[in-house]
């Protein structure tokens, strides 16, 4: 069940990063910044980071073990959400960039390492079933519950129908997500 809740972190960031960055268009001081005008390019840094971080997995698993790698992943989610909450597309754009880089660690160290762990720790006779269960729990149930829960938080703090800037609401939303990810470390 812990995997279901941990997978929610991934759904939170993937579902709301672009609307969050785009919401800065309503703030005059940020409307013409790189972070607003190139939100998709900024978000694509996450994919680059993910591609590079996957290469680190054999090294970190060998040197730190699966428990520490999973802990690093959860702390990376906390950092990613916290940086989103503190950053802005102006002078704080570096926090967004760092958040995109941290995403690779958060995603790969949890999902890929978890899948490798299941592969290495299960008997060959049940390995495919175990992998299937892992995928259902993370990408199926976890993704669904995560998306619904994250939307409830966004709906609570951000008025998506308002033309007024929603920066405070978005910041609070990201801090709630960071707190949630931090609480999962104890599961």
Predicted regions and their residues:
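C-terminal ends and interior cores of transmembrane alpha-helices
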Residues: 76-89
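Intracellular juxtamembrane helix-capping segments at the cytosolic ends
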Residues: 109-122
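Helix-loop boundary and gating motifs at the non-cytosolic
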Residues: 10-26
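Helix-to-loop junctions at the C-terminal end of transmembrane segments
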Residues: 53-66, 154
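Loop-to-transmembrane helix entry
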Residues: 27-47, 95, 172
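A membrane-interface helix-boundary motif in multi-pass transporters
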Residues: 152-180
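Loop-to-transmembrane helix entry/capping segments in MFS-fold secondary transporters
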Residues: 36, 124-135
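Short, small-residue-biased leader/transition segments that mark boundaries at the very start
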Residues: 1-5, 187
